[in-house]
């Protein structure tokens, strides 16, 4: 049927349309022509993913890649979601009629702007800033700001798209957004970073607000940067409001926010391990990265009985078979802002290896990629499997390549996607928004207990969605389906907007 329809389309596509019909093999009245058949007559462009079984999904993806062919990271994120929707999309014809997926993969708003600032030598420098407000169907846009030389529109769009699902899974009323700049804070003085942040906020303030868009931190944006950004917003608007999360405790931040993503990752992993008759107890854990997510994943994994034996930064990785002391890592990264090699000054028996990719060759039971996107490829996944790894739990945003995910799942390892297991940070940001709105401050224990409950709830929702649509145990598919359905329902209720 599909091939016949495409043949018809090829024979008629260059003929003129008049009188409301196609001239040639078919003469049909267009207003009465069902949209679903129009989609079938329109052949997928080259590049449509063969794993997308639905013609509708193929068309959505091929149109997307044709529109922005250079945005590879964004394409990867969208394709991964669409593949998970194969088995459920045909039971929802209302999505096609409302062009819901076409709207879902297109941001509501993209803001790009220049960011001029002065360095310590008096030289004027210019960077590019972004804010992608992806979807506000279930709440104000919510998502972090990333300052890193690799930042471009494709990366910010992929992060905003992923954020929409992640926020949906928390069950809190937050839409999806993301922003950032190609500014590199590494090697910059506090004064330079302050001037950059002030310039960045001098444009961003026009587009955000506590009921519109609430940014937070991400790679390159920690407590220092959030403080500078918040101060500039407050000065420009002459108001104190919860417009940013990840703030310092002294000016409206939430206890446990710093620890939230790493702790949440381990709470999710513990729930998935438990559901499969396993636990952290006695397991060797490898965690890539050494930022907030990695450091606090180390702490919680250790508290749950695991032993973290390897961590990394962009220069290399350390191996400590006795277990990496997370307190030492906090001292190195949060106080001294030094490279991970400095760990050897504290623990001479540890080993340091140049280059960060080799960390996945370290034998372990549990792997937690917490550094950056596409850091764990197919070759690395095979190395983990060869050493008896039982599970890969994503802590960074999209850290595993599609090939790696295929290898991991085909080998029967447990796998959790970042949009689910990485949601602890934004969940606690939502709790910070609630505290700011009510002018309250909860204890660390209260926030941590709420976080644990949210992460266990996310796992349960993902597992249930996967089972409902015939993919029991596939937490990646379950996360995509559960996150999508809530936002899709809200979009249908709100009409074409």
Regions flagged by a language model, labelled:
Residues 27-50:
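Short, Lys/Arg-enriched N-terminal segments with co-localized hydrophobic residues
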Residues 50-255, 486-495:
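N-terminal ligand-binding/catalytic initiation module
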Residues 52-77, 272, 385-497:
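Adenosine-phosphate binding glycine-rich loop
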Residues 212-216, 239-244, 287, 310-313, ...:
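General beta-strand structural signal in soluble alpha/beta enzymes
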Residues 256-361:
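Glycine-rich phosphate/diphosphate-binding loop of Rossmann-like nucleotide-binding domains
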Residues 316-415, 420:
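Rossmann-like adenosine-cofactor binding region
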């Amino acid at each position: 049927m599909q091939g016949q329809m495409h043949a018809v389309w090829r024979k008629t596509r260059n003929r003129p349309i008049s009188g409301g019909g196609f001239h040639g093999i078919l003469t049909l009245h267009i207003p009465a022509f069902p949209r679903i058949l129009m989609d079938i007559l329109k052949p997928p462009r080259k590049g449509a993913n063969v794993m997308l079984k639905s013609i509708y999904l193929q068309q959505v993806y091929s149109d997307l890649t044709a529109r922005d062919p250079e945005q590879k990271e964004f394409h990867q994120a969208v394709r991964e979601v669409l593949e998970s929707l194969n088995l459920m999309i045909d039971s929802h014809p209302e999505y096609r009629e409302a062009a819901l997926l076409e709207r879902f993969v297109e941001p509501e708003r993209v803001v790009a702007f220049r960011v001029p600032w002065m360095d310590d030598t008096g030289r004027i420098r210019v960077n590019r800033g972004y804010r992608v407000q992806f979807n506000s169907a279930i709440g104000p846009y919510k998502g972090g700001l990333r300052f890193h030389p690799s930042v471009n529109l494709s990366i910010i769009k992929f992060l905003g798209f992923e954020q929409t699902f992640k926020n949906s899974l928390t069950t809190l009323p937050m839409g999806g957004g993301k922003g950032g700049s190609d500014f590199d804070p590494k090697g910059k003085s506090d004064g330079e970073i302050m001037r950059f942040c002030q310039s960045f906020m001098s444009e961003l303030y026009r587009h955000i607000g506590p009921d519109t868009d609430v940014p937070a931190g991400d790679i390159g944006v920690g407590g220092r940067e959030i403080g500078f950004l918040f101060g500039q917003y407050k000065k420009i608007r002459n108001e104190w409001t919860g417009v940013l999360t990840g703030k310092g405790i002294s000016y409206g931040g939430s206890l446990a926010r710093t620890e939230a993503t790493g702790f949440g990752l381990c709470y999710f992993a513990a729930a998935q391990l438990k559901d499969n008759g396993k636990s952290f107890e006695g397991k060797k854990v490898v965690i890539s990265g050494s930022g907030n997510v990695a450091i606090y994943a180390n702490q919680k994994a250790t508290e749950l009985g695991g032993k973290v034996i390897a961590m990394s930064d962009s220069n290399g990785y350390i191996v400590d078979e006795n277990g990496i002391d997370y307190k030492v890592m906090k001292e190195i990264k949060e106080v001294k802002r030094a490279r991970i090699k400095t760990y050897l000054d504290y623990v001479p028996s540890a080993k340091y290896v140049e280059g960060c990719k080799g960390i996945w060759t370290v034998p372990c039971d549990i792997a937690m990629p917490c550094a950056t996107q596409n850091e764990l490829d197919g070759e690395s996944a095979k190395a983990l499997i060869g050493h008896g790894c039982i599970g890969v739990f994503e802590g960074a945003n999209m850290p595993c390549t599609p090939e790696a995910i295929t290898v991991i799942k085909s080998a029967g390892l447990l796998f959790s996607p970042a949009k689910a297991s990485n949601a602890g940070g934004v969940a606690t940001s939502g709790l910070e928004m609630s505290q700011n709105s009510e002018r309250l401050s909860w204890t660390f224990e209260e926030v941590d207990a709420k976080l644990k409950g949210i992460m266990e709830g996310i796992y349960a929702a993902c597992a249930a969605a996967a089972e409902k649509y015939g993919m029991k145990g596939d937490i990646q598919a379950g996360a995509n389906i559960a996150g999508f359905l809530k936002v899709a329902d809200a979009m249908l209720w709100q009409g074409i907007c």
